[in-house]
């Protein structure tokens, strides 16, 4: 059997391309080296709870085209991301808003809060030289010390004084009682989990799991006219120019015989001493209920740790610095010469994509490629 396209990777980018190609009458084979579909949005049902196996994925977008597209494949619930920050047992609302400022300083009005922040920002004069100075110049010393410093240092594995200022371009400050983390018009979680949504995208398409494309490249390439490759771009070229770096995340999952561990989907641990950056309690993405609306007796939590990425680790976040940017540009030159191969997605383009920008990017590519 000869296919029009082989799609490498069954995450959002690969699954949407495969769906659109099939809709245009093309024959498609999807291969994925994992034992499951859906890439990093993969959810697995355990104890009646859809567990986000590769970290919390909360869909949010202002792009109506993207929302109208993806809601064909899943009904979304009304989940709103309102994380809580835990600093040594003190709980604060995120993002920084009037609840946060009231707890921090006892201020009651937006005017009092604004005055307090302005007064603390004055500590930094001139151009901030590092992330610490940048953060203080945006939100002041108290918020920086309790809610930014420890969390950021755990995430990057480095002191805030050693991190470049540009990492934090802005820290949203809200002088309202609005706990909604995202400023997005559309937001939610697919009811029944992301895996079900990706299954709907791949309906009627041949998928081969546990199949490493790069190990079987010659025989798979012979099966198709074109390849859509969503794996790491440096791996495609055998790392011959060097290895692109990522930040990685490690998860420790635990099932607990209690109905409620922390009362919220996400709690960030913002002190330096707690080794994890946050704890996700998955049942709250779907309001603690199963599909029939029953309360779930158990709960599943994931402790999240940031870790230095080593070759072979799961790549999560591309490192947005000059060295990696220059190396990617060299790989991109090679990729542009690879006729018959389209590189796409977070790993294929070495680019930090949210889910909605991934969808927008693949839909644009489909228009160009499939017409």
Where are these regions (language model features)?
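Short, well-ordered alpha-helix to beta-strand connector turns
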Residues: 3, 25, 205, 223-225, ...
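N-terminal Rossmann-like FAD-binding beta1-loop-alpha1 element of flavoenzymes
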Residues: 3-30, 366
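Short, solvent-exposed loop/turn segments at secondary-structure junctions
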Residues: 12-13, 35-36, 99, 153, ...
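Glycine-rich FAD pyrophosphate-binding loop
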Residues: 19-47
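Mid-domain catalytic core of redox enzymes
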Residues: 24, 214-334
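A conserved beta-strand/loop capping segment in the N-terminal third of enzymes
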Residues: 41-51, 59-113, 171-176
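Active-site/ligand-binding neighborhood in enzyme catalytic cores
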Residues: 85-92, 99-226, 230, 235-237
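C-terminal catalytic lobe of FAD-dependent flavoproteins
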Residues: 314-371
